Amino acid sequence: LYRLKNLKALEVFDKSGRKIGEVEDIAIDYYEKNVLGFIMPKKFLSKKNFFSIEDIIIFGDTIVVDKISVYEGLKFSDIKGFNIINTMGKTIGNIEDLIVDKNFKILAMIGSKGFFYKFIKGKDIFLLQNSVLGKRNILYLGKDEVELKSLPHSIWREKDA
């Protein structure tokens, strides 16, 4: 499994071995739960800053691509920070990251209720299949009885003897 924060800054090379950039963002299809490709910073006088999953030749510590093109669709940065709202209208977190599998399917969103909350209680994991994307928010339809968490590191916990 990958998190977007682990994919950012991966170096991208063309098939001749020339470095063409680094991953800055991902292009997503929210309703199909897919990563469509990766976004790089735009170069001077060039609008090409995207490569699709199909254009990837090698994916590992670096990425080698066949070609780059222009992308105008939804990016993760467009929804990062959106409020996640439950069916009662209560804000239950803000989107911070995505969890993606090795086939580039988006499995879940990672959200947090705030800076201090994430250090004390951890982050929440929201399944994408239980959500609806709005213009400024995400409606989460999941059950409140089931909570998935990413627990904080043992900063304040006692060490086992």
Can you say where each PLM-predicted feature lies in the sequence?
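Peripheral interaction segments used for macromolecular assembly
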Residues: 1-161
